[in-house]
From Swiss-Prot:
The keyword Magnesium does not apply. Its EC number is 1.14.15.36. This is Sterol 14alpha-demethylase. One of its GO terms (molecular function) is iron ion binding. It catalyses: a 14alpha-methyl steroid + 6 reduced [2Fe-2S]-[ferredoxin] + 3 O2 + 5 H(+) = a Delta(14) steroid + formate + 6 oxidized [2Fe-2S]-[ferredoxin] + 4 H2O. The lineage of its organism: Bacteria, Bacillati, Actinomycetota, Actinomycetes, Mycobacteriales. Residues 1-20 are annotated as: Disordered. GO terms for biological process: sterol biosynthetic process.
Amino acid sequence: MTAVKEVPRVSGGEEEHGHLEEFRTDPIGLMKRVREECGDVGWFQLADKQVILLSGAEANEFFFRSSDSELNQAEAYPFMTPIFGEGVVFDADPERRAEMLHNTALRGEHMKGHATTIEAEVRKMIEGWGESGEIDLLEFFAELTIYTSTACLIGLKFRNQLDSRFANYYHLLERGTDPLCYVDPYLPIESFRIRDEARAGLVELVQDVMHGRIANPPKDKSDRDMLDVLVSIKDEDGNPRFTANEITGMFISLMFAGHHTSSGTSSWTLIELLRHPEFYAKVQQELDDLYADGQEVSFHALRQIPSLDNALKETLRLHPPLIILMRVAQDEFEVAGYPIHKGQMVAASPAISNRIPEDFPNPDDFDPDRYEKPRQEDLINRWTWIPFGAGKHRCVGAAFAQMQIKAIFSVLLREYEFEMAQPPESYQNDHSKMVVQLARPAKVRYRRRVRD
């Protein structure tokens, strides 16, 4: 360690829990200030923890290249244990976690079947829409992406046994990610109480489905989904290996990142297209041309829509699903001449890095053409274009989330015209929880398209 400089501290945070209250109300404002005052490496106080925020290519590269044994993820997210349950993914050791997350449903050959499944789910959701009406984006996309995620990642059989209660409980669970978890994830506050009740509700729903599966085991292999497999596993004494509580935890962990990514990004993609009618028209025309011959939504077709692809990338840059990624240092390190000590929290912020003006000119503008040759700003800035992280820590579900969103819009934009039902600037994110969600109201109007 040759570092001699001390990591600079950002201004503010004189209260008992340091910058916690500001982090709960305006996290992006706080992190912006860290970069403005301290540069690529600076720290803020989160309850009793110092969080060293890294930004810019060099510091981010260190963050994303580090292994779990160097910068540990599980320790950095105390809110995950009450949501997932003990021993599931975030509590598991890195090898077990890699094995659990390398779910077959996310492999290439399975992705091909998912496109058709997602198209069917979208059509099911909109079959009662009629000629025109209004939807709340958060409500619609949160429910739709619960069904698409469960159908693709767990199985259609399980999906077909769900109703809107599953989506409602799941939404409440995501709201239980208040940064107060850095003081104590079991504090007696309302959002944590609701979180625990919602999780118990999910366990009950899964338990009911499990009872049915035990009473009526699958006839053959083609009738089995992931739940059947988990229910059939026995321990050495011949008893069921997993409880409903554990299986619910596995399902939550499987869907957690993918669901809120797909739900929030779908909402923001539509909002940004509505704010920029010329791009909306371009994307719609591209879809009309692609599907003009009546082909179904397929994995193959979804690889041929560059305008929608670019609009989606730009939406992800401006509205990343996670605004901060955290780890805990397991050793002593040096980054850009600054020391990082064992036990300190280290963070990277997609919300900050994605808008560095030197890398992304006019960073606040929605400009999908940034991804066209020769600019290709996502490829040139591989350590600062980080809506899904980067390097070995790139989100495991990134390809699935992007494919899912493209499949959703392949149906919606061909069947309906959309328009804003409130002022363009009134659509905002709610940053009061670690899982960012759209602030309500977030309504749009739709009317069925008239075909020539």
